[in-house]
Amino acid sequence: MPPQPPPAASASASAPDPAVPAWLRGLPRAPEYRPTESEFADPIAFLSRVEREAAAYGICKVIPPHPRPSRRFVFAHLNRSLVSSCDAPAPSPAAASDSSIPPSSSSPPPVSAAVFTTRHQELGNPRRGRPTPQVLKQVWQSGERYTLDQFESKSRAFSKTHLAGLHEPTALAVESLFWKASADRPIYIEYANDVPGSGFAAPVQLQRKKKQKRETAPMDEWEKSSGWRLSNSPWNLQAIARAPGSLTRFMPDDVPGVTSPMVYIGMLFSWFAWHVEDHDLHSLNFLHTGAPKTWYAVPGDRAVELEEVIRVHGYGGNTDRIASLAVLGEKTTLMSPEVLIDNGVPCCRLVQYPGEFVVTFPRAYHVGFSHGFNCGEAANFATPQWLKFAKEAAVRRAVMNYLPMLSHQQLLYLLAVSFISRNPRELLSGIRTSRLRDRKKEDRELLVKQEFLQDMISENELICSFLGKKSVDNVVLWEPDLLPSLTALHPCSSCSKAPEKKGEDGPRIGSTQSSSKDDSSSDGTACMTGTQSKGLSMDSKQAPEGEKLDTDDGDDLPFDLSIDSGSLTCVACGILGYPFMAILQPSRKALEEISLVDKERYKLSCEKEICSNVLPCSPNDGSSGCPLIANRSSSPVENANLSHQDVKPIRSDISLMGKEFNGTLGKHIGTSCSCSSENTIHPYGDTETPEKKIPSDCPGSELSKQSGRGDVNVPDVEGSEETISWNTGCAFARPRIFCLQHALEIEELLASKGGVHALIICHADYVKLKALAISIAEEIEFQFDYKDVALANASKSNLHLINISIDDEGYEEEGTDWTSRMGLNLKHSSKIRKETPESQEQPPLSFWGLFSKPSPISVVSNLKWLCRKARTPYKVIGYASSPDVVATPDKVKPAVTKTQIDTSGNAHENIGSEQTLQQDCVLQESNDVADMCKRPKVNDQDGHSLINIPIAVAEYPMMHQVCERPVSVSACDDPICSFDSQDSPTTVAVSAGKPTREQCGAESTELSTVKQFLDNGLIAEGGSMNFISNHEHLESDNATSVCKDEQLQVQQDQLAMVLCNNPNTELVAGELHGGAASSTLENEDSCGNTSYCSDTVLKNSEPDTDDQPETCDRSVVLVTPKSSCDQMISSSDRSCSLTLDCPVSTDAAFSSEKLSMAHDLMGSELQAVHNSKAEVVASLTDVKGAKLNSIHTTQLPHESPSSDFIISEGAQSASTTAIPRKNGTSMHTESNSIDILLGVLADESKVSSGKDEVGKASLTLMTLAGNDQSADDVTQDEVAEITDPSHGFCSSDIVSRSIGSSNRTNIICYARRKHKRKSGSEFNINSPQSLGSFVRSPCESLRPRTRPAIVEDMTNETKTAEASTANKRKKAKVEAFQCDIEFCDMTFETKAELRAHQRNICTDESCGKRFSSHKYLKRHQCVHRDERPFKCPWDGCPMTFKWLWAQTEHIRVHTGERPYKCSAPDCGQSFRYVSDYSRHRKKFNHY
């Protein structure tokens, strides 16, 4: 408890009234209503009518037609309600001897006097000692107990002190003083809130209902008084929650503050914090007597904005939204409405005087304070409009870790059927009353009935959707009374003790009267025995019409419907569901996948549970396994493993899906006569059949043993249906309860992981409710589209399953089950988000949308991080001619992938995959060109055949009009490359060198191939990454053609690219040089008798400068067998690359240099294709900053002199591929989509001589279309950045595109701004939202621009170049700066921190305190550290302390020393702590 400062000095009598701030004077006033006598007779109908207008303010005032009750009336009935508690404490001596209380009231009160406790409230901001936020006020129990007269006397004395300067204080003047005091030095006020009781007299109707005798003598004086008339009206807060038409009428239990009122006794400046009501209910507040009370409110539709303003401006903005909701729920946040108004949040004010009601509406935040001593009362109710907020309110309450109090569905159902009249004549259509009151009542009831029928239809649709799944086939009926233990089903289905009603200022304080509900019961849906449940229901036939009360209590539930705790909590959203719920448990396969990380813990847990839940079987069972439940007489409570057979035609509810495990399941683990915690499975049929055992050597048997799941038997498939085994022994696999909506989502989520076991349960009253719903639909002429669902009574095993699915009392989510592991547990997920706000992983279900964002976000803002703020400007720097292609607008059509495969007579397979969310267009060749391209399949002498692979050149994903051609790829005879070998290793064939014009016609000398090297450090699941370096000349053995040149010269410092197409091959070549650059494409028009149409040679001109080092050319073809590719696609990391070693021959000789390749770690997607038995994968590898490991080279024998050219990429070029295939088979792929993307990337160059030099960069991105390649796979691109070690610059985006002119293609160069500041969106490329069907910007797949990584130059073949990858930045070594002051050994990262430290300033960001001595600064560091150097010297005491004075005070606990004694005469009190002594002197003025 913080020390109390002395009371504020009395203001001068001549002090002027405080100036009213402009924001306060301009606040709009909430509406007020004055109902007539007839309107006042039905509060729910009246409030439902005014709610349309008043809800826009969030609050309103209702002035009753009766005068306010007298002070004597209120005090008499309030004292009576307070002393009704048997454990009412006596008033404290301190309160009785308070110097501020007059002598007449300081005498000890009688034993029977009503007393109550209070709380201390802080008002003001401390100047020091407490960091922000200062909107959170301290509230603690005072420990004092007062009678009403004592507290009134103390309050008047306090008001006289603080309002002495105001002659006649107005409401605005007091409000100005309050908000001024909230910013000044703290003062402490007392407030008695959440005191159970009422100032109303018990209504006569309630007394008759309870068969109580009226008290004639004491009540004669109150008869016909204003208080008596108001108490016997429907506005009595003791009956408002149970008023006809209120949805809270049928809440099972009496919850103080909700269904029964609570009293609030305040003094001047007693405040209540910003808050909303529990479950966002309506509240009705009545001020009995005393000073006014001011309210401020924000409408419900602006609640999210208020929460965000408080989070940012009140809590500093560093708090997670869920955590800020929890802090708001503590009801200690006091923020001026001025902050809200400045941030655009509307707010209104209202002044409540004695005898007036104040109504708050759902989701409306409100705050307020008292102008002096007063006594108020509050309770909750709900109009039909509350149903719009009920669901989200329940979820929000669960996120704040509060137990639910009610089920909105159950309350809706019971209220709707309560409107059914007992008189059958009123069910006939056409009979309408002419009374205005009755017509309004019918309108109110019509809304509830429509909501009821609509909810019935929605639940029916969910049931029908669920029954269409394979995981569930029927619905069972259950009742809470039928569970194995009546204490198993706890209130609110969470089986934990109900939370006490939280009042305006936080948790409920101890009061003089205990809660009206039993401590063993819970809140809104507390568990009730069958007798209690039936006692609350009312038989319509037994209620005579003469006993029908004025409060319409005769409209109770018909058909013996009972109010019980049949609602269960959904694990995923925290809502109490009714009447349908689903019990889910993942299948064994799904559980093993979910628990992959914690697999060992899962096994041990299962085995432990099995050992602990083994039950003996009867000796005469005659089987080693668990017998059928039909042969057992044990009770369901003692069974940990149950089986059953339901009545036909319903299938067995507990069964084992044999298909799920391919019919191979484990046998019983135990061979003795015992059963495990698993359910024993038996066949379904009219007669019992013996269980079918599975041999121990089957695969499933071993799996069963490993996973700890025994007693699993496969039923006879021919004579019985499949059954499901529920794992009831493993804590990780425990069945959990979900609402139907989230159960469907989870079922779909687990469908791909192995499936889920499901059981739908329905409350037994649903059968009656359905019959009543049909009658209501006929009455209001509502189209009731309902599909009948087969229902069956729950068996004993069903009841046992329900019982173990319900949480035990006090159950806490510790994250040990499958729901927490998958992020499906709302409480656990919110707990994790509170503990680790930086980890904001989005759960897979939809309910987190309520809390993940402060306000609804549009689609555009959702995509903000997916693209750059503005598209990078570009300019056309040249064009490439292509005489073979003529692009016309009428030949542009959307791209649809079509793959045609011809392998030795195999059937052709055409598969079309539509490209979604992209504007892809391809250009069709003209007719004459198409004729030229038609070539027969040519098989070489060695059996090689061609595979026509289409190639497209375009910028991705900016798909413009592009030109695409087929590429001839031949098969390979190398057994390593064989597609028929499923286990063949994979290597890469690389042609790297620096071609020259003289080498074009030269004879090939020798073939050099490379040996694969597998880097285990970069292996993804199911795939491998091979790094190969080739340092030999790769020359063609068969040069039969003469190159024909077509040269394109571009200006210096710019990109030079040449694009030339021939009938079967499309080549894209790009060159980048710092100096004069030129690019020459040499292509052969006439084809020889080779297996490829043309040979391509890229010539690179040397730069003018001699000191510029040579750059190496790199190119890669990646091919993988089908089996390996399957593993890659199924892998979670699909960005792995597989390679294949194939022989290479070409007409050009290339000199090779260093080759560095690395796996692209930036989340690019692997592009895969299945071609019949083979799968070809093209994946680009990152060569920038790669770590190379042990690169070796070998030579493989040259298979054929006519081997096909595979790939050749110059130092700054991109080229095409030719892949041979074995056995003379051919594979032709024709596509109208963009299947192979080639782009050349170059980053901005560092200026060395006043000019921007574009550095060496080259990229080949190839995707081979396949017959089962999905559209999404095609859209994912592989990107790499290449760094020239000789230049200090990175490559940027330079993409060559074929754009739709008739015979030329523009070459576009992107100009990057220098030193462009990186936005936060550039670092979110790996976000899960970036995957999927979102549209990416052109440079979305690029890594964030970082400083260039340095790649070491390799001088020999075996040297490994070590460099960091682009996204792993090299961290600069942090220099430590040490303090040189004597006896100080602290070090700092920066000199600024060191200088501040030497000036005796704390360097902690949240502190910044200044000290007079360095010694004090060093001692202060304990505040920010976990060091506790001082230990208690007492033997056996483990206490440690940060401060010496704390150790000294603690020692007094052991010694009993009380060194501080009061010096006032006749006091003599002694104190252990100086704070207690100081507080005592200030309180009693003992100086």
From Swiss-Prot:
One of its GO terms (molecular function) is histone demethylase activity. Keywords: Chromatin regulator, Dioxygenase, Flowering, Iron, Metal-binding, Nucleus, Oxidoreductase, Repeat, Transcription, Transcription regulation, Zinc, Zinc-finger. GO terms for cellular component: chromatin; nucleus. Residues 232-398 form the JmjC domain. A zinc finger (C2H2-type) spans 1377-1400, 1400-1424, 1430-1454, 1460-1486. The keyword Transmembrane does not apply. Binds 1 Fe(2+) ion per subunit. It is found in: Nucleus. Residues 1-23, 86-113, 494-555, 684-718 are annotated as: Disordered. It comes from the Eukaryota. Pfam families: JmjC, JmjN. Fe cation binds at H275, E277, H366. InterPro entries: JmjC_dom, JmjN, Znf_C2H2_sf, Znf_C2H2_type. Residues 498-507, 542-551 have a biased composition (Basic and acidic residues). Residues 30-71 form the JmjN domain. Residues 9-22, 86-104 have a biased composition (Low complexity). Its cofactor is Fe(2+). Its EC number is 1.14.11.-. Disruption phenotype: Early flowering. PANTHER family: LYSINE-SPECIFIC DEMETHYLASE (PTHR10694), LYSINE-SPECIFIC DEMETHYLASE ELF6 (PTHR10694:SF45). Histone demethylase that demethylates 'Lys-4' (H3K4me) of histone H3. Involved in the control of flowering time. Has a suppressive effect on floral transition under long day conditions through the demethylation of H3K4me3 in the promoter region of the flower-promoting signal HD3B/RFT1. This is Probable lysine-specific demethylase SE14. It comes from Oryza sativa subsp. japonica.
